[in-house]
């Protein structure tokens, strides 16, 4: 009964979120959103979402805007900007960069896809070729700058959101290039040193690099327009009170972009910059995402009631978790080790796990390298605890959920693989159907669950075995060593989540409290900055995988069903959401 009720609730949430997100994205029918593909330089297929206001026709062409996401994101990350631009009568191409989303790899190639996106936008007969704007966040800004360099006469204005001009990522800026530039650089942007050479984001007004682009020597005044819009030399700096990824959730950051394009491209209607609705879509896709996670548990519960999978049902046998001081030592290790190793191991992974034809996603490889190293370290520490202490108390492979009292049950292990596959397949189907009928994915902010392309599916399959090993080890520690002997399944799930995910929350607090207090992120190497952003996603992911691990361990008495489900889910998540650097 509980599984059926959870199924109903999850389906309602998915449908509700999909319907509301679609209505907001389409502005209640005032905007048509098309999923488009087109051939770019060298025959690379490019992907985008095209937002077409009803007022834009071949007889009444409207200004066009190319909106481009940042590194390891996809086109939907720009939906807040795209929705609001389109509501103001502008045609918007929300582009997947090369090697991102559904655009062909490799990442960084062909000017990040920016020049091809601009060229495609100009082929549309309902776009006014004399009024085209470029907008890009972070690396999307570099893509926009590449477009401006390759096609200098084909755009009128540009908005750089949390981005910069200059080597090695983009052409150097000066008072004439790019034309009519607005820089929206948040007061707590994590990349201020990388982008503009200032350690504190709020000090970008003093950046010598930015002064050269503005053609001034004095401190830049935010909100003041320098140069001339008519001559194409206009410059302005806006500073919303948020972070680098926070630009996507900021009405101020989006409003500044709207305001600049109204000044440079002209107003198609009278909607002021502050009139925004995009956040309802963000809330709606979050509701769908929550529904999808609940569907995972509902599907698992109901599958265990079927004849084929009922043999997987069981209870933990002879549990011998750590107690007393040993438990607290284990908790401290599980708390500190992942966050202490996060930056060193991902940096090592940048060198040791380069993108290749086997594992073609650089950031995904770094995360996988970190996972494998942590799994090995966990195995060593767990073995020390077992042989030095817990074996004497009766702890064994049965206690840790690795085998049954009858021995290593390979049939159950194999059945657990099929069980996990069907659970994930059901959730995946809900994502595909939502994408098909409502043209949205499941997401909140920078956490997104999307349908995979064929190439991304092949990448996910390559991640499966190493990730299965990691999540088996994760479950053995979480359920075999750190499991509470008291309480209900729900209480044990909560405790598992605290043990499995609390460290990531503390890591984010350590990183972001100084930044939000007006300082900088406390890291010693600018190369680590990207993994500060990636760490944000680790918190919700480890909440989810901790819940899955605990739930299916309690339902089956073994670690495998939960571990394989986690491996498939995270392999899917990483393959679909990361940049692909090498074609396979």
Language model feature labels by segment:
Residues 2-39, 47-49:
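An N-terminal hydrophobic leader/cap segment in hydrolases
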Residues 4-13, 288-292, 332-333, 373-376:
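Hydrophobic H-region at the start of alpha-helical membrane spans
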Residues 13-18, 292-298, 571-574:
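Hydrophobic core segments of alpha-helical transmembrane domains in multi-pass membrane transport
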Residues 18-22, 297-301, 339-347:
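Alpha-helical transmembrane segments of multi-pass membrane proteins
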Residues 30-277:
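Soluble extramembrane regions of membrane proteins in the secretory/endomembrane system
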Residues 171-178, 290, 300-303, 307:
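Conserved serine/cysteine hydrolase catalytic core
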Residues 268-296, 304-328:
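Cytosolic-side membrane-insertion boundary helix
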Residues 332-584:
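Alpha-helical transmembrane segments of integral membrane proteins
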């Amino acid at each position: 009964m509980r599984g059926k009720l959870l199924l109903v609730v999850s389906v309602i949430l998915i449908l509700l979120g999909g319907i509301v997100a679609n209505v907001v994205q389409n502005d209640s029918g005032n905007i048509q959103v098309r999923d488009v593909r087109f051939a770019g330089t060298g025959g690379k297929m490019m992907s985008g979402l095209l937002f077409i206001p009803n007022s834009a026709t071949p007889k009444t062409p409207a200004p066009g805007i190319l909106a481009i996401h940042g590194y390891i994101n996809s086109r939907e990350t720009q939906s807040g900007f795209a929705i609001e631009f389109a509501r103001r009568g502008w045609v918007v191409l929300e582009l997947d960069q090369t090697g991102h989303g559904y655009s062909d790899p490799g990442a960084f190639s062909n000017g990040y896809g920016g020049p091809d996106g601009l060229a495609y936008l100009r082929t549309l007969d309902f776009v006014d070729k004399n009024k085209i704007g470029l907008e890009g966040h972070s690396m999307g800004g570099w893509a926009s700058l590449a477009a401006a360099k390759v096609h200098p006469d084909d755009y009128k204005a540009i908005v750089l959101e949390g981005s910069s001009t200059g080597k090695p990522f983009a052409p150097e800026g000066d008072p004439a290039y790019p034309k009519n530039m607005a820089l929206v650089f948040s007061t707590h942007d994590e990349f201020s040193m990388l982008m503009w050479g200032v350690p504190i984001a709020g000090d970008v007004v003093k950046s010598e690099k930015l002064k050269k682009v503005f053609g001034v020597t004095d401190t830049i005044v935010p909100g003041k327009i320098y140069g001339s819009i008519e001559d194409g030399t206009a410059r302005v700096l806006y500073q919303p009170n948020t972070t680098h990824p926070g630009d996507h959730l900021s009405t101020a950051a989006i409003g500044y972009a709207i305001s600049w394009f109204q000044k440079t491209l002209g107003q198609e209607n009278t909607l002021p910059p502050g009139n925004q609705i995009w956040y309802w879509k963000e809330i709606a896709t979050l509701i769908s995402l929550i529904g999808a996670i609940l569907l995972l548990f509902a599907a698992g519960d109901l599958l265990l009631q079927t004849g084929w999978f009922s043999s997987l049902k069981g209870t933990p046998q002879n549990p011998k978790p750590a107690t007393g001081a040993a438990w607290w030592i284990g908790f401290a290790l599980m708390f500190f080790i992942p966050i202490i190793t996060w930056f060193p191991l991902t940096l090592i992974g940048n060198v040791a796990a380069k993108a290749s034809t086997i594992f073609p996603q650089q950031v995904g490889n770094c995360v996988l390298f970190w996972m494998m190293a942590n799994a090995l370290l966990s195995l060593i520490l767990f073995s020390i605890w077992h042989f030095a202490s817990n074996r004497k108390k009766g702890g064994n492979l049965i206690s840790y959920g690795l085998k049954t009292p009858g021995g290593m049950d390979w049939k159950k292990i194999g059945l657990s693989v099929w069980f996990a596959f069907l659970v994930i397949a059901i959730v995946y189907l809900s994502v595909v159907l939502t994408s098909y009928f409502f043209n949205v994915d499941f997401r909140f902010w920078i956490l997104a669950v999307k349908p995979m392309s064929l190439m991304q599916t092949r990448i996910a399959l390559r991640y499966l075995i190493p990730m299965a090993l990691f999540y088996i080890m994760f479950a053995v520690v979480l359920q075999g060593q750190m499991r509470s002997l008291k309480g209900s399944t729900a209480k044990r799930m909560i405790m598992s989540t605290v043990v499995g995910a609390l460290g990531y929350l503390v890591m984010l607090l350590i990183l972001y409290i100084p930044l939000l207090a007006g300082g900088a992120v406390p890291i010693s190497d600018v190369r680590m900055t990207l993994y500060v952003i990636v760490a944000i996603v680790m918190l919700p992911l480890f909440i989810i995988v901790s819940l899955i691990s605990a739930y299916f361990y309690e339902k089956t008495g073994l670690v495998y069903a939960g571990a394989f489900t986690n491996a498939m889910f995270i392999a899917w998540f990483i393959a679909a959401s990361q940049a692909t650097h090498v074609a396979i």
